[in-house]
């Protein structure tokens, strides 16, 4: 049965060339861009729907950022704490420096002991070390804040291209693994045609050659350039859009309204153009 069907389809292709009709049958195709988040998480907000037009920079979706926001807040709190400690530490260092200077003067006049001077110097060194420690703590907290802010920004995913939203794979409340597509977008530039040329006319096809494209209902023919030729022939193409069966093909179309439509799932409808 499959061999008979393949033979019939092959005759449909070769018949076009024999009848003088040199049209090559094919269909439009498109390379979809799949948009994923670099991190895993629960989808918190979805800002687009299928069929929506988006441009570069438009918000597509966000992931739950509770943990990332908490990490950012903790880093900010550590910075604030370090800055608060720094004020007190600098005051202590200033007092220790004055005491050290005083003890040095007293020692020269013989009014104090070497032990008192050593204690003053030790207090100064301790205060200076505390300043260095607080500086290091603040620097580490700032580095942590930078990382936390970056992780938080990764929870917000924007479009890197313009085009039409083709599909939604995860919706709010669903868990999206890292690097797994959540939204797919078809950029206009990624749309092309795939057509099939009989072997008897294969010599007419060359890379870089211009072709004219016609479609039912189009305002006029289109022009394209051959960009790929298969390395070997195949018996029949996977799908045949012949003149005889073109009218039997149906294409899925979706229509939406703000706030939704007051219909029940499964309710039959008739749609007419306005």
State the predicted function of each range:
Residues 21, 55-164, 169:
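Amphipathic alpha-helical coiled-coil/rod segments that serve as protein-protein coupling scaffolds
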Residues 47, 53, 65, 169, ...:
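Exposed loop and linker-edge segments at protein-protein interfaces
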Residues 59, 65-66, 181, 187, ...:
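Short, surface-exposed secondary-structure boundary micro-motifs
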């Amino acid at each position: 049965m499959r061999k008979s069907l393949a033979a019939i389809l092959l005759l449909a292709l070769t018949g076009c060339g024999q009848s003088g009709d040199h049209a090559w049958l094919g269909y439009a195709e498109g390379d979809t861009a799949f948009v994923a988040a670099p991190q895993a998480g629960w989808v918190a907000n979805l800002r687009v729907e299928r069929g929506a037009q988006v441009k570069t920079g438009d918000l597509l979706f966000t992931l739950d950022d509770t943990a990332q926001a908490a990490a950012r807040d903790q880093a900010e709190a550590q910075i604030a704490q370090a800055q608060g400690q720094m004020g007190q530490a600098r005051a202590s260092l200033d007092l220790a420096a004055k005491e050290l200077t005083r003890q040095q003067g007293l020692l020269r006049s013989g009014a104090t002991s070497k032990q008192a001077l050593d204690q003053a110097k030790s207090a100064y060194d301790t205060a200076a070390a505390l300043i260095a420690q607080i500086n290091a703590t603040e620097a580490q907290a700032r580095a942590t804040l930078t990382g936390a802010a970056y992780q938080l920004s990764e929870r917000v995913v924007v479009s890197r291209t313009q085009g039409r939203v083709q599909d939604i794979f995860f919706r709010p409340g669903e868990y999206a693994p890292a690097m797994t597509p959540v939204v797919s977008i078809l950029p206009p530039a990624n749309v092309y045609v795939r057509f099939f040329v009989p072997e008897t006319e294969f010599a007419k096809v060359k890379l870089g050659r211009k072709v004219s494209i016609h479609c039912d209902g189009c305002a006029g023919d289109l022009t394209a350039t051959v960009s790929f030729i298969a390395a070997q022939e195949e018996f029949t193409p996977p799908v045949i859009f012949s003149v005889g069966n073109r009218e039997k093909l149906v294409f899925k179309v979706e229509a939406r309204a703000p706030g939704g439509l007051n219909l029940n799932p499964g309710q039959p409808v008739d749609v007419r153009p306005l």
